[in-house]
């Protein structure tokens, strides 16, 4: 049975870079943001519920209007809870199906910016936090999303603080542009194999 890790971190922290490096090293990672978009696009029940909540224009032309949904989602914590209540249960089920086909592997991962807030943390065995200084995160996100600083800060304020995520994490990766990532990821993999060895020993005893 594979050990499941949850990779999280704030906007612009570099979660995707860490996930990509893990995949290069042979650890498959379920990218919840990408997979949730696929689930939303193909599940007629979700589409109807989102249209009822946000308005028909959220699926204008038959495609999800990601900008409109994001604007609604980040407008208030109530809106976020409403949207997440529609999408997250389906994504959890999809992740369970995905991971059930990878039981022969030692380590698999799930990447989610809201791993803890969404309840996805309940689906994994340990949490890996990707940390970057706030100023650097904002700079990265503004450049990547072509958004304003205020828009990015609004999204950051809507999520759990880095400090709280670090407290909940079993392992923290620093992605500040100075500390090399690969040695940290190799250290993470070694840490996970120690955990696997411990679990196997405990099971045999």
From Swiss-Prot:
Top EC category: transferase
Disulfide bonds: none
Chief location of this protein within or outside the cell: cytoplasm
Signal peptide span: none
Cellular location(s): Cytoplasm
EC number(s) given by UniProt: 2.7.1.24
Reaction(s) catalysed by this chain's protein: 3'-dephospho-CoA + ATP = ADP + CoA + H(+)
Chain residues that bind ATP: 12-17
Pfam families: CoaE
Source domain of life: Bacteria
Single GO molecular function: ATP binding
A GO BP annotation: coenzyme A biosynthetic process
Domain DPCK: 4-203
Residue ranges that the Swiss-Prot or TrEMBL entry lists as coiled coil: none
UniProt keyword annotations, A-Z: ATP-binding, Coenzyme A biosynthesis, Cytoplasm, Kinase, Nucleotide-binding, Transferase
GO cellular component: cytoplasm
Pathway in which the depicted protein is active: Cofactor biosynthesis; coenzyme A biosynthesis; CoA from (R)-pantothenate: step 5/5
UniProt-listed HAMAP family: Dephospho_CoA_kinase (MF_00376)
Similarity remark: Belongs to the CoaE family.
Record's function text: Catalyzes the phosphorylation of the 3'-hydroxyl group of dephosphocoenzyme A to form coenzyme A.
NCBIfam families associated with the record: dephospho-CoA kinase (TIGR00152)
Name of the protein: Dephospho-CoA kinase
Organism: Bacteroides fragilis (strain YCH46)
Phylogenetic placement of the source organism: Bacteria, Pseudomonadati, Bacteroidota, Bacteroidia, Bacteroidales
């Amino acid at each position: 049975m594979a050990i499941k890790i949850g990779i999280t971190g704030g906007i612009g922290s570099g979660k995707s870079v860490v996930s990509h490096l893990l995949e290069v090293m042979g650890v498959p990672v379920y990218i919840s943001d990408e997979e949730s978009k696929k689930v939303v696009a193909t599940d007629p029940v979700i589409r109807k519920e989102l249209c009822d909540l946000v308005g028909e224009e959220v699926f204008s032309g038959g495609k999800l209007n990601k900008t409109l949904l994001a604007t609604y989602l980040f407008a208030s914590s109530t809106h976020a809870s409403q949207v997440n209540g529609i999408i997250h249960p389906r994504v959890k089920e999809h992740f369970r199906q995905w991971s059930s086909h990878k039981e022969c592997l030692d380590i698999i991962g799930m990447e989610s910016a809201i791993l803890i807030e969404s309840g996805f943390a309940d689906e994994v065995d340990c949490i890996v936090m990707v940390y970057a200084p706030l100023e650097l995160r904002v700079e990265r996100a503004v450049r990547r999303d072509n958004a304003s600083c205020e828009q990015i800060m609004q999204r950051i304020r809507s999520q759990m603080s880095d400090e709280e995520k670090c407290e909940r994490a079993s392992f923290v990766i620093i992605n500040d542009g100075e500390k090399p990532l690969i040695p940290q990821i190799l250290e993470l993999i070694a840490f996970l194999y120690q955990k696997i060895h411990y679990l196997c020993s405990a099971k045999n005893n």
